[in-house]
């Protein structure tokens, strides 16, 4: 790389040729060189990397994707360019490998990165969708509105890995958003018990008073799991009116603690 900065004429052509050598050791050294050079000269290595990513040999492909991941950290635009092509490939291995790199461009990829995640969340392959859904928690930290839309479209995915990432993301979204509040109420009715549990636990954050009790009572009619029924029963009751003595006392503010020096002072005798 340092030599290429000073004199780069034809160097990338030589590198490309060495990657096609018959000798495996030569190709190995050339792949190592590409991994060092591509993050510095992404445009000069673009065609070489594009070819290596689709190489039939597993080791070539492994090294190429490792190179793409490092390049994406330095040059988000280059990462998005290659990923945009990879997630459209018919070869599911390319789509799976590309989806795993999406997290690298999530924070800085902007609208292009969001589109790549969206397309991958709609892929027919569960592993691709799972890798794309792993981007959602990080996306929620930089663009909560977009993350909310993607969570909404992925919440009822049949894959357990996708749902796990959706649940993780739900806890980081803006709870004051009406859209998020509706998402949580919908999730509390889902067939998946883990998703229901996560959403039921969020109800007391997005709802209060009569509305909370009304929703909890409605959910209680269809909930079958003992653990979740117990939780909903507590949410559906007005503790001030229907709670036990212990529950009512628990809601009262505790008395201020009396400092020791005052507690030791004896009352004056009369």
Where on the chain are the PLM-derived regions?
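Structural detector for internal amphipathic alpha-helices that build alpha-solenoid repeat scaffolds
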Residues: 1-6, 17, 28-40, 62-74, ...
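Short inter-helical turns and helix N-cap capping residues of alpha-solenoid HEAT/ARM repeat scaffolds
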Residues: 22-23, 56-57, 90-91, 124-125, ...
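Short amphipathic alpha-helical surface patches that serve as generic macromolecular interface elements
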Residues: 193-200, 213
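Amphipathic alpha-helical scaffolding segments comprising HEAT/armadillo-like alpha-solenoid repeats
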Residues: 6-18, 40-52, 74-86, 108-120, ...
